Amino acid sequence: MSVSITKKFYKLDINRTEWEIPDIYQDLQPVGSGAYGQVSKAVVRGTNMHVAIKKLARPFQSAVHAKRTYRELRLLKHMDHENVIGLLDIFHPHPANGSLENFQQVYLVTHLMDADLNNIIRMQHLSDDHVQFLVYQILRGLKYIHSAGVIHRDLKPSNIAVNEDCELRILDFGLARPTENEMTGYVATRWYRAPEIMLNWMHYDQTVDIWSVGCIMAELITRRTLFPGTDHIHQLNLIMEMLGTPPAEFLKKISSESARSYIQSLPPMKGRSFKNVFKNANPLAIDLLEKMLELDAEKRITAEEALSHPYLEKYAEPSVEQTSPPYDHSFEDMDLPVDKWKELIYKEVTNFKPPPSYAQVLKDVK
């Protein structure tokens, strides 16, 4: 790991990628990488506070990349809820220069969480009380996200982070889209994906996230993936085996003729009893699962309704289950060249103000 110090920023090499970051962030250690960036953990100088820093990969490589960068930035800036990941800081090298020409990199700083639900499921058996608390926090975060007019669309155990106090945050908004837009294509990991996305219905709503929560909750209870499909068809078959083949009135709602024909070609299936599948589970947990894993999205429970379900009564506190101001997604309809997206991103970065508590940390460090 090579390091060269400049006045405020310093450079270091992490996994053969050059990082250039403010010197208040020290002891960087890589924690993960993907198609859209690398993440390292860091210590805020002079404190014992740890943060996560994400270096966006090729943010201005194309108009598609740049729009995605803008989307992720806007969503993270909008979110202000203790169960949803939000931005602590944004930076780019050469801020003093103030030139768009030198604006080539974007780094996002967020809370560092100890583990994700994947780790938790693999490491330990969770008590019913633990499951209640985790599911409550997921739904509390989702109520906030949905009230902003946003669908997450990629909820899965690895996108839900937990710290040692069992406090939870929903992560990874890069793929989220506003609810009003029609959306297509591959998004969520198949195992947690609602059937209406898989069947390519154009008009789906926020309850696709509730289906995902149902799959996650089932996994928290049993420590096994509920619908581990090897492909779309296998996935759909597993769902039908569990829930039964849908009635004719439901089939009429499916806009995809091929999906409708396929379901009609299946032998009639009665479905399995949730009580038999989740043999030792709290009966109230089973009731909530049945309401979340409802094939008909119009009948599926919402996040707000689920929060008042008797299973979560111990933790329910409507006065702190806040909603969000509407998220402005008008830019989604914009088709701009890279340079224009870059200008918009630069404006968002330079206008950013850290949350008050973190602003105080930064002030004390300086």
Curated annotation (Swiss-Prot):
GO molecular function, one term: MAP kinase activity
Pfam families in UniProt: Pkinase
Primary residence: nucleus
Keyword set, alphabetical order: ATP-binding, Kinase, Nucleotide-binding, Nucleus, Phosphoprotein, Serine/threonine-protein kinase, Transferase
Active site: 154 (proton acceptor)
Residue numbers binding ATP: 31-39, 54
Superkingdom, natural source: Eukaryota
Ranges of residues in domain Protein kinase: 25-312
UniProt EC number: 2.7.11.24
Enzymatic reactions: L-seryl-[protein] + ATP = O-phospho-L-seryl-[protein] + ADP + H(+); L-threonyl-[protein] + ATP = O-phospho-L-threonyl-[protein] + ADP + H(+)
PTM sites of type Phosphotyrosine: 186
One Gene Ontology cellular component annotation held by this UniProt entry: cytoplasm
Principal EC category: transferase
N-terminal signal peptide: none
Motif extent (TXY): 184-186
Regulation: Activated by threonine and tyrosine phosphorylation by Mkk3 in response to environmental stress.
SMART domains (UniProt xref): S_TKc
Phosphothreonine PTM positions: 184
Note on domains (UniProt): The TXY motif contains the threonine and tyrosine residues whose phosphorylation activates the MAP kinases.
Purpose of the protein: Kinase involved in a signal transduction pathway. May down-regulate insect immunity gene expression after prolonged infection.
Family, per entry: Belongs to the protein kinase superfamily. CMGC Ser/Thr protein kinase family. MAP kinase subfamily.
Identification of the protein by name: Mitogen-activated protein kinase p38a
Organism: Drosophila melanogaster (Fruit fly)
